[in-house]
Amino acid sequence: MENLEFMKKFRPEELCIKEFKYWIVCARKKQVTLGDTIIALKRETPNMSDMTKEEAAELVEVTKWYENTCKEKLGAIKFNYIAMMMHDFFIHYHVFPRYDKKINLFDMEWEDRNPLNYFGSVEDTEDDILLKIINYMK
């Protein structure tokens, strides 16, 4: 993954939760809901139709791992996947676990406020909290 803007914005090497052969799962700097991630293809291509059969098959495994991890460790009940690719022209998903109750973790209370604007005014999550989330989910 060599897209410099993506690297600067999402810091995948630093915020990596799990790496697969074709995909990388990274914590989002803005934790709208606990466990928000970016799931990104590790090569640059702007079109979903350019995904190979192997990459598509592995994406199923990636999402199974991610959803099971969030359910078991964080108490998530469902997930929202967004793949707009309006600014970053390569295949990646913003994934938001959803919750039906408040979660107390890392000396913080996390509440799913049924976010309608996932990219709105949420502040960046502090790096030490992001690292705790990453280590907890590994």
Language-model region placement:
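HIT superfamily nucleotide-processing domains
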Residues: M1-K138
